[in-house]
């Protein structure tokens, strides 16, 4: 089925869905007055009654109107914000498992309180995923005030919390956090050595804020927990960084920016061999050098400082391409990060081995119910449905959108583009109109900043180097004469309100005074009641002046690879029916045109003077064509990632379920004895041929347990060598093994035996799984070559992956038994490696 046909089918029922959502809003409106005269205590009692009714069998759907009316009243009392009807509709859509498309400024944060409260009544917890730690903390504090009136506890998961704090936060009715924190906790829980070490309590209902950013943009990025691997940092990284500098693009190697790959040419190979003093780079003994060479060229050509990463305090730190934020603790894998460190001349840190991994796609599929919100989902509706079984519904705006979206202005080269952009910003600044400028990298944001400073335009810069000021900068971005230069503003997740954001400004002011709603809620509420009205009044007065100046002007400096990201940037302006404008300033040398439509760009460049702006349908078509190519390519990649990861996901589910049973079950003696029987059976079957080689059989058996019966005793028991059958051998050896097991148990005591069994099996599972992850990654890297032999790589990956998994399970059985009989019985109460020590978290960008 084509994507366009699927989109038409998905949109066909939207009218019926909206009608149903409107009816729900009308029902809530009809009963909301019942709660206006209640005291806070009475409201809490009503909320508790709803919980009891649900536990007694009443469905959440039937109590939805009452629950939503209570939340609306609680919000009005604490925040001074009453949910609009469209917000009630959005909340109902989330409860029903939809992705609610709600434009920027429609109050998505407040919308989430409705389904969060309703679904928390089950007692199984609700997770709300935000785009960063700051918003997780801020939303949990502000929305937590609403939940508190209703008798609920609110938690938040932050990067610097210890395990006991995290466990406490997960026990709350509603827990806020980022996708990374939730995902890494899931992985760490499945590396725990006792139930007490685990922090999560299941996956019931999750609400994803900026759902497209999480499930689409970051879908290809797996969460990886790594530990240090053996071996020292190789001098080859430094050596090859120098070699890469000596090579020339186009002459010694090719670069494909679209596919993010490099290929070394014959002249380049000859140069490398000469520089290394070797005769053949591709001899088997030199195979490891090829990886060093490829990574050093990638680091040189495909990974740019202040775009893909920054160097802070002598450390290479990855910049999130979607949000512009630093991904603290993340590293590229397979030697690429070390190659970049060598290129930059900073300390080269050791490579790490994967201990646990999961993609965001498969992590969020663990939840019984999933929903999400975003300003731009309809363009990806077919992918949401096919991948996650999530329908999309577009919620109407509370007020009509009156923003003016001006045609793109295109220049021949980048320098002229930025000069004209800066002149335009100065005009807006002079008349008091606030401006938001979206750039694609730290480097570009700093270049624009220099041009504005030359023109005397006061401004703020928001990029990966100063993200700590983010809340204040965004809160003031809609004020009179405010100019804000931001990298990838699309993912910032905070409203830009004309005149300033009174809620955020109030929170910043109270925090500056040392007030914390979680530590002293009563004092905080009193201070809020005093500070908020003043700031609200001041910002509204200033908003009137901003409206007269034309509202917020949004300027894009490049078209993104996805139309959705462009729309998100535009959507920062014109919230809640406010006036506003948007315009993109482009050049024919921008990355999008250069990579994906170079022919059209070259043809136009040849006909246009340097200082002339282009506004033509041809340019628009070329841009749309380039974006369509990239969107199609990225969607296919995500689809492919999921197909391959589904193989590993089934294996991961089996291992983690098995591991969890061991943690929770306590006594695994029967399981261990089954391991012993299976291992013995496999060994005997491998030797059961026409002529028995008992010496070889006994040698193999002794690797798993101390054999107590001799070959002579076995022969005598059978009544002669000719009467020995496989069944007889099996019976005698199993009897002997059972005796050895009982002897081992009597030597160390039953309690120590149970403890030893549990720790040995967990240790072997973890080590074998770690090795299996490495082998599966190695298999996936080379599986594409099977297509040359007319074989489907995915089918081959599934088949060989299954065989490797079965082999791993066999190793787990044999090694567990071997260790059980041979390891020192004095078992430490601590695990060999504490899974709760902060891991190294990787960004696998599939390069």
UniProtKB/Swiss-Prot annotation:
Coiled-coil ranges per UniProt: none
EC number: 7.4.2.8
GO MF term (any one): protein-exporting ATPase activity
Family in the record: Belongs to the SecA family.
Chain sites annotated for binding ATP: 87, 105-109, 495
Record's compositionally biased regions (Basic and acidic residues): 835-847
Catalytic reactions of this protein: ATP + H2O + cellular proteinSide 1 = ADP + phosphate + cellular proteinSide 2
Organism: Tropheryma whipplei (strain Twist)
Record's function text: Part of the Sec protein translocase complex. Interacts with the SecYEG preprotein conducting channel. Has a central role in coupling the hydrolysis of ATP to the transfer of proteins into and across the cell membrane, serving as an ATP-driven molecular motor driving the stepwise translocation of polypeptide chains across the membrane.
Record key words, sorted: ATP-binding, Cell membrane, Cytoplasm, Membrane, Nucleotide-binding, Protein transport, Translocase, Translocation, Transport
Cross-referenced SMART domains: SecA_DEAD (SM00957), SecA_PP_bind (SM00958)
Lineage of the species this protein comes from: Bacteria, Bacillati, Actinomycetota, Actinomycetes, Micrococcales
Protein name per Swiss-Prot or TrEMBL: Protein translocase subunit SecA
Protein encoded by which gene: secA
Pfam families given in the database record: P-loop_SecA, SecA_DEAD, SecA_PP_bind, SecA_SW
UniProt cross-references to InterPro entries, sorted A to Z: Helicase_ATP-bd, P-loop_NTPase, SecA, SecA_CS, SecA_DEAD, SecA_motor_DEAD, SecA_preprotein_X-link_dom, SecA_SF2_C
GO CC annotations on file: cell envelope Sec protein transport complex; cytosol; plasma membrane
Region (Disordered): 828-847
């Amino acid at each position: 089925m084509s994507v366009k046909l699927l989109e038409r089918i998905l949109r066909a029922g939207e009218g019926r869905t909206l009608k149903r959502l409107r009816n729900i809003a009308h029902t809530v409106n009809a009963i909301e007055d019942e709660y206006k005269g209640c005291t806070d205590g009475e409201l809490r009692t009503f909320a508790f009654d709803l919980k009891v009714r649900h536990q007694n069998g009443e469905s959440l759907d039937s109590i939805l109107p009452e629950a939503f009316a209570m939340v609306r009243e609680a919000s009005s009392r604490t925040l001074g914000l009453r949910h609009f009807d469209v917000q009630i509709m959005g909340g109902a859509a989330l409860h029903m498992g939809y992705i609610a498309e709600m434009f920027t400024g429609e109050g998505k944060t407040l919308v989430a309180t409705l389904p969060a409260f309703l679904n928390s009544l089950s007692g199984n917890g609700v997770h709300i995923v935000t785009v960063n730690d700051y918003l997780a903390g801020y939303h949990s504090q502000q929305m937590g005030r609403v939940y508190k009136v209703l008798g609920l506890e609110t938690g938040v998961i932050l990067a610097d919390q210890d395990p006991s704090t995290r466990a406490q936060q997960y026990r709350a009715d509603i827990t806020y956090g980022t996708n990374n924190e939730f995902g890494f906790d899931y992985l760490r829980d499945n590396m725990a050595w006792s139930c007490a070490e685990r922090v999560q309590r299941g996956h019931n209902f999750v609400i994803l804020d900026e759902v497209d950013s999480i499930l689409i943009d970051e879908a290809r990025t797996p969460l990886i927990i790594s530990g240090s691997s053996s071996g020292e940092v190789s001098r080859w990284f430094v050596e090859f960084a120098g070699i890469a500098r000596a090579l020339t693009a186009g002459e010694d190697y090719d670069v494909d920016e679209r596919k993010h790959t490099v290929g070394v040419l014959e002249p380049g190979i000859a140069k490398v061999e000469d520089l290394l003093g070797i005769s053949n780079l591709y001899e088997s003994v030199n195979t490891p050098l090829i990886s060093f060479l490829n990574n050093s060229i990638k680091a040189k050509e495909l990974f740019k400082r202040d775009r893909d990463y920054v160097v802070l305090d002598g450390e290479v730190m990855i910049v999130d391409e979607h949000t512009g934020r630093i991904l603290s603790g993340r590293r590229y894998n397979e030697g690429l990060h070390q190659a970049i460190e060598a290129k930059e001349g900073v300390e080269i840190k050791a490579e790490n081995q994967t201990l646990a991994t999961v993609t965001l796609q498969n992590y969020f599929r663990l939840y019984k119910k999933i929903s999400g919100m975003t300003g731009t989902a309809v363009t990806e509706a077919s992918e949401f449905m096919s991948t996650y079984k999530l329908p999309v519904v577009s919620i109407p705006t509370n007020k009509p959108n009156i923003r003016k979206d001006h045609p793109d202005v295109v220049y021949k080269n980048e320098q002229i583009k930025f000069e004209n952009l800066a002149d335009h910003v100065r005009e807006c600044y002079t008349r008091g109109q606030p401006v938001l400028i979206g750039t694609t990298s730290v480097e570009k944001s700093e270049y624009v900043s220099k041009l504005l400073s030359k023109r005397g335009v006061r401004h703020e810069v928001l990029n990966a180097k100063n993200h700590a000021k983010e809340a204040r900068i965004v809160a003031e971005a809609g004020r009179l004469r405010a100019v804000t230069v931001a990298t990838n503003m699309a993912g910032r997740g905070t409203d830009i309100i004309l005149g300033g954001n009174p809620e955020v400004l109030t929170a910043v002011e109270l925090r500056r005074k040392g007030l914390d709603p979680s530590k002293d809620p009563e004092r905080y509420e009193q201070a809020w009641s005093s500070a908020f009205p003043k700031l609200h009044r001041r910002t509204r007065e200033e908003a009137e002046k901003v409206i007269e100046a034309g509202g917020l002007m949004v300027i894009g400096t490049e078209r993104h690879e996805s139309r959705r990201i462009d729309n998100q940037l535009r959507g920062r302006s014109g919230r809640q029916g406010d006036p506003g404008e948007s315009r993109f300033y482009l050049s024919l040398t921008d990355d999008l045109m250069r990579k994906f439509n170079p022919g059209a760009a070259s043809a136009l460049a040849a006909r246009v003077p340097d200082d002339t702006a282009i506004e033509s349908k041809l340019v628009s078509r070329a841009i749309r064509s380039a974006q369509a190519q990239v969107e199609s390519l990225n969607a296919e990649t995500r689809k492919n990632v999921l197909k391959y990861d589904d193989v590993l996901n089934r294996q991961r589910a089996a291992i983690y379920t098995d591991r969890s049973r061991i943690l929770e079950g306590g006594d695994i003696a029967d399981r261990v004895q089954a391991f012993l029987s299976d291992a013995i059976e496999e060994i005997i079957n491998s030797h059961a041929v026409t002529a028995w080689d008992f010496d070889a059989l006994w040698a193999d058996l002794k690797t798993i347990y101390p054999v107590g019966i001799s070959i002579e005793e076995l022969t005598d028991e059978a009544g002669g060598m000719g009467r020995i059958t496989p069944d007889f051998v099996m019976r005698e050896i199993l009897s002997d093994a059972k005796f050895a097991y009982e002897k081992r148990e009597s030597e160390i005591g039953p309690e120590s035996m149970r403890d030893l069994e549990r720790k040995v099996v967990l240790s072997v599972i973890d080590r074998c799984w770690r090795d299996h992850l490495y082998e599966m990654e190695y298999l996936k890297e080379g599986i594409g070559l099977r297509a040359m032999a007319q074989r489907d790589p995915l089918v081959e990956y599934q088949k060989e992956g299954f065989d490797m998994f079965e082999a791993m399970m066999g190793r787990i059985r044999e090694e567990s038994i071997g260790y059980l009989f041979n390891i020192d019985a004095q078992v430490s109460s601590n695990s060999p490696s504490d899974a709760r020590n902060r891991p190294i978290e990787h960004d696998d960008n599939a390069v």
